[in-house]
């Protein structure tokens, strides 16, 4: 049903002759839920070959479908293995509309980047490598290239970032090579101590400098 109706939407955009000025994005917020019942529904998902599922920061909870349709602007049938994240959708749409990225009140930088150069080049211009950091209920992750750090430090530490930093400093995290081990089954912390130390310090530095911003309070009409 979903596939049929997405097809109807694309057909309608073509019929209205607005396809060259319309971007359609299909993406999920998380990997499939592998549990049944009230939380998972009747038909549990399968995220193989990845470990984990929805509500985890293993790859089974993070890796999702991501498709973009922009007729005449993005190469049809292009497939990319470059790493991207949800923040990139916002930056990409702004770039397509010719709107500069916001300055975030002049403090924290925009984390997403436009994917248009990558898509318009048919993948010849790679997406720059960067660290991707995840946190959900004490499940911490950092990915850079094929390497990924992971740990569960407990839910009671979030969003108390100072307590979380102290916990991370005194915790042993797992180190995976996703290129060779997409199921996150082999901890390489002891085999690759230099990689481990660099990524762990980057993760600690990130949470030590978390400064969540909220948008300005909306004004009330008539006041």
Feature names for model-found ranges:
Residues 32-57, 74-78, 82, 87-174, ...:
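C-terminal cap/loop subdomain of S1 sulfatases and analogous C-terminal strand-loop tails that border
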Residues 18-24, 64, 128-129, 144-147:
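Loop/turn elements at helix/coil->beta-strand transitions in domains of secreted/extracellular proteins
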